[in-house]
């Protein structure tokens, strides 16, 4: 067994300083029945806690670190920028360069606005959609998490699902009444919502791959069906690609599935590990944003040169071949985990989209939030604990996915599979 004494002491202090001892709820490790593990440093595919334990990391800061920790080119670029000034409150050339790089790989984005978080991106995109259409209501999907904006905390995923919270207190009924929530992968329910409220629906917002109820890919035809119904009723289609953007494919989720949204929200990978978000889309819509239009949105640190540099240096290193390599490694990891689970009769379902993998402790096919919730959470907690002791760092929630980086080696994958075999062997006694 590994020692976590320094982490335990750090957490005991943290709970006196911050709500629940953390600055984002899922980091509290409540779902895995452990105290949080405090990290000290990372390099490549490895991460090291303050007790000196080493892990192969599949959290990667919840997805942004697609090149692994402390990538040499990103770090060197950040050093250069830090020496010339970390923020100016004025435009810089690197904003143009990152914008062009994003738009080259995401043709649906004709104009882009940089912000400082994924939440800021989705909140701003919804305000824009309402302002552009003159309508009030939005459609979202059960278990999909789009940040902590009031309109979006209705039947949300991520930490909301992890902690088993109902709709968040503090969201006024007058706000909640404009959010229509339907099951993910259920086009019939979407059509029913439009038949009933279509004249007042401004937008449908969706993750191309639902990443905050585990990893749940879209069923064939689902995303195209959303495109069709929004076109029919004059509503906007917003892809929340904060997680899937430049993660599932070189051309992101919209390129991978061949469906073009009106607006796209980005984050995570485009910041290379620094706080970044962005939203963009059709020029006729984006031109409504101030100062070119009347819909207001602003930010002190939007376009921050440090964050823009980290994003630019990250995207610059990603090629179509990168994603082919990801696919092979992710396939091997998913197959290996499944084989290990079968060997010890562990109920499981594995979903995969590019370099995102979700493992559920249920034999039921997971296609939406209801089926995701059939996973045995006690088994997941035991699995997490055993894998942590084996030196494998996983997201401490059943409702979050694993991520791969370019730094993960074939050896890392095989070590992870062998660790899972040992973990499942120990877990088989509680079935």
Swiss-Prot record:
Catalytic activity: (S)-4-amino-5-oxopentanoate = 5-aminolevulinate
Compartments reported by the entry: Cytoplasm
Primary localisation category: cytoplasm
Keywords per UniProt: Cytoplasm, Isomerase, Porphyrin biosynthesis, Pyridoxal phosphate
GO terms assigned for molecular function: glutamate-1-semialdehyde 2,1-aminomutase activity; pyridoxal phosphate binding; transaminase activity
Pfam families per UniProt: Aminotran_3
Subunit structure: Homodimer.
Matching PROSITE patterns: AA_TRANSFER_CLASS_3
Cofactor: pyridoxal 5'-phosphate
NCBIfam families: hemL (TIGR00713), PRK00062.1 (NF000818)
Pathway assigned in UniProt: Porphyrin-containing compound metabolism; protoporphyrin-IX biosynthesis; 5-aminolevulinate from L-glutamyl-tRNA(Glu): step 2/2
Name by which UniProt lists this protein: Glutamate-1-semialdehyde 2,1-aminomutase 2
InterPro entries recorded: 4pyrrol_synth_GluAld_NH2Trfase, Aminotrans_3, Aminotrans_3_PPA_site, PyrdxlP-dep_Trfase, PyrdxlP-dep_Trfase_major, PyrdxlP-dep_Trfase_small
Domain of life: Bacteria
Positions of modified residues (N6-(pyridoxal phosphate)lysine): 268
EC number(s) given by UniProt: 5.4.3.8
Gene Ontology terms: cellular component: cytoplasm
Record GO biological process: protoporphyrinogen IX biosynthetic process
Chain's gene name: hemL2
The family this protein is said to belong to: Belongs to the class-III pyridoxal-phosphate-dependent aminotransferase family. HemL subfamily.
Isomerase among keywords: yes
């Amino acid at each position: 067994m590994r020692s976590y004494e320094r982490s335990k002491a750090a957490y005991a202090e943290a709970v006196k300083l911050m709500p629940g001892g953390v600055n984002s709820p899922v980091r509290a490790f409540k779902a895995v029945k452990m105290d949080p593990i405090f990290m000290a440093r990372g390099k490549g595919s490895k991460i090291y806690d303050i007790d000196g334990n080493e892990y192969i990391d599949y959290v990667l800061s919840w997805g942004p670190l697609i090149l692994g920790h402390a990538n040499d080119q990103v770090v060197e670029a950040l050093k250069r920028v830090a020496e010339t000034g970390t923020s100016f409150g004025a435009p810089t050339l690197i904003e143009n360069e990152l914008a062009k790089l994003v738009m080259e790989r995401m043709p649906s984005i004709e104009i882009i606005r940089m912000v400082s978080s994924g939440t800021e991106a989705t909140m701003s995109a919804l305000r824009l959609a309402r302002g552009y259409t003159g309508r009030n209501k939005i459609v979202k999907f059960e278990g999909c998490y789009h940040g902590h904006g009031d309109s979006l905390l209705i039947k949300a995923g991520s930490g909301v699902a992890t902690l088993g919270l109902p709709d968040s207190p503090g969201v006024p009924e007058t706000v909640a009444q404009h959010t229509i929530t339907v099951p993910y992968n259920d086009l019939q329910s979407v059509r029913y919502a439009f038949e009933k409220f279509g004249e007042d629906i401004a937008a449908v917002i969706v993750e191309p791959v639902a990443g905050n109820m585990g990893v749940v890919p879209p069923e064939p035809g689902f995303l195209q069906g959303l495109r069709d119904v929004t076109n029919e009723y004059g509503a906007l289609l917003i892809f929340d690609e904060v997680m899937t953007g430049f993660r599932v494919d070189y051309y992101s989720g919209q390129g991978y599935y061949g469906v073009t949204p009106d607006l796209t929200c980005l984050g995570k990978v485009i910041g290379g590990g620094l706080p970044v978000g962005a939203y963009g889309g059709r020029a006729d819509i984006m031109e409504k944003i101030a100062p070119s239009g009347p819909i207001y949105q602003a930010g002190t640190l939007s376009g921050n040169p440090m964050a823009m540099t980290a994003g630019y240096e990250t995207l610059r290193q990603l090629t179509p071949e990168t994603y082919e390599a990801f696919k092979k490694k992710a396939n091997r990891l998913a197959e290996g985990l499944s084989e290990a689970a079968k060997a010890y009769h562990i109920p499981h379902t594995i979903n995969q989209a590019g370099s995102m993998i979700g493992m559920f402790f249920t034999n039921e096919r997971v296609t939406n939030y209801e089926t995701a919730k059939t996973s045995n959470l006690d088994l997941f907690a035991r699995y997490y604990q055993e894998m942590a002791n084996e030196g494998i760092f996983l997201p401490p929630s059943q409702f979050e996915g694993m991520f791969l980086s370019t730094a993960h080696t074939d050896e890392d994958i095989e070590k992870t599979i062998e660790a899972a075999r040992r973990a499942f062997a120990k877990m088989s006694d509680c079935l």
